[in-house]
Amino acid sequence: MSANQGASGTASDVAGNTASASVTGIDIDQTPPTVTYAGNAGSYTVDENVDITCSAADNLSGVASNTCSDVHAPAYVFPLGTNTLSASATDVAGNTGSASASFTVIVTGASLCNLSTRFSATPQLAHALCVKVEDIDSAPTPGARAGRIGAFIHEVDAQTGKNLSAEEAAILIALANAL
């Protein structure tokens, strides 16, 4: 901000009258607004919720517009790996500020078990799926691991439309394949 600036001017009318004026103490906003993300845990397993808020502030001329958007969603709706949120804000003086926040979504055996339990219509299915996930985590070889992932997927396929919706089944299968 440029503080305590001044301006002066003179005006004349058609009759030849003139007047002058000076003004001091003018503050010129040259500071961009701030964009802030809060609540970011940085890393989320697929069974957790992502709750990140975005805010824009400008203490000088005020915020004219911003692209902030809060995120309140289950982690499994985001792609696995790094996800980045970005927002910008423009103040009344035309200055622009921006920020971004990144977070990572991962799948683990425990998080896939928890999500399977959440999606399952029966406790028996939840238990069966969790046992299969535990078997994946304890597989002694890559071949055994692939076979156990296949057994989990087969069980999910068998329960699709019965004790799991097609959408839930697709999510569980994609996550199992990512283990």
Where do the model's predicted regions map?
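Soluble extracellular-acting proteins and domains
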Residues: 47-48, 82-85, 95, 100-179
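Aromatic/hydrophobic beta-strand junction motif of beta-rich domains
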Residues: 52-56
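Non-catalytic surface loops within mature trypsin-like serine protease
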Residues: 30, 58, 105-107
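Serine/threonine-rich, repeat-prone extracellular segments and beta-strand-based repeat modules
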Residues: 1-28, 40-47, 59-96, 101, ...
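Proline-centered linker/hinge motifs at extracellular inter-domain junctions
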Residues: 32-34
